[in-house]
Amino acid sequence: MLSIKKANFEDIEKEWAFVRDMPEDENGLTNAWHGISHDDFETKALPDMLRFERGENLPDWMVPETFLFLWEDDTIIGQFRIRHYLNDALREGAGHIGQFIAKEYRGKGYGTKGLALTLEVARTIIPEEEIYLRVNRDNPASLKVMQKNGGRIVKEDEEHYFVRIKK
């Protein structure tokens, strides 16, 4: 059964393996913890994820952010991130939500279902009337995921589509 769960210590082994193996930067979603050791994940990365959600000791440029993992039964197949509100850089940039589906699960509808589950959570957190997303122009699959969840392109530049979804 498909479900979405916040980062937590109870699932540390599977979260660590998933985050460790996520690319450092793919389609605009960065992963500062690519290749991380188990010890560093347990003592630094996972505590940081939980601290980011609480908005504690964030750098000035950062906003609170919730890390969610998409599960199919007992396997993590994706990660979604919800930025709780927008600053100027996010409003003109990455927006509220970042998403990643592991390569072996792409093209099977998991992105669409995962974003739908993430939007349910986001709607309880985000104060803005619309949810902002951005997608690389060379990533039509992610654009389609957003559109299947009610997304509409409101702007584009040479590299990106800027998408909005009604709250």
PLM ranges: what are they?
Residues Y105, G109-L117:
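Conserved acetyl-CoA pyrophosphate-binding loop and the N-cap/start of the following alpha-helix
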Residues G109, I126-P127, G150:
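Short glycine-rich hinge loops at helix-strand junctions in the catalytic core
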Residues T112, R137-K155:
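Conserved active-site alpha-helix within GNAT-family acetyltransferase domains
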Residues G98, A102-R106, N136:
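Residue-level recognition of the GNAT/N-acetyltransferase active site
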Residues T124-R134:
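Conserved GNAT acetyl-CoA-binding A-motif
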Residues M1-H96, E156-K167:
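GNAT-family acyltransferases
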Residues Y85-N87, E104, D138:
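Short coil/turn motifs at secondary-structure junctions
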